[in-house]
Amino acid sequence: MSLIEIEFERPGNPVDTIETVAALNDWAFERSDDDEITISLGGSWCDYHVSFSWMEEVEALHLACAFDLKVTEPRKTEVLRLLALVNEQLWMGHFDLWHKENVIMFRQSLLLSGGAEASSAQIEGMLPNALVNCERCYQAFQ
């Protein structure tokens, strides 16, 4: 039997850990279902809405940080080029243009395959990484 065929029992939902971290830090949050939570945090340039989604089928915790910055059609090509240049400089996560809403978002995933659990330290590391990058690049995307 290969390691790929072994099924692991996951002790808990990583979103539960995020909810605990958010509550301990007095962050405003909304738990929309068992596998998703959104945290609202104020930044220097705007308010950020950070969604964490647990995707069990790929055993990954996905972070998406959107900010209220709509990209108009005439600027779309320019912004996509800028996103590519910015993404070249990032070690973790990336910026993306969500075409459905024409908003820029920062995305990052934490792979938790084989029954691994997300620690509060990992979660507390993902969030500042997203916010620091959003704050650093916000004005360039305007």
Task: For every predicted segment, state its role.
Residues 33, 91-94, 98, 137-142:
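Long, hydrophobic, amphipathic alpha-helical segments used as structural scaffolds
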Residues 104-108:
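Short, aliphatic-rich beta-strand segments
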Residues 67-71, 110-119:
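A generic structural motif
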Residues 116, 122-136, 140:
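Long, contiguous binding/interaction regions
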Residues 66-103:
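Short, internal acidic amphipathic alpha-helical interface segments
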Residues 20, 24-68:
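Ser/Thr-rich, low-complexity intrinsically disordered terminal regions
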Residues 8, 12, 73-77, 116-124:
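Ordered, soluble secondary-structure elements with a strong preference for glycine-centered loop motifs
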Residues 1-21:
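Terminal, regulation- and interaction-focused segments at domain boundaries
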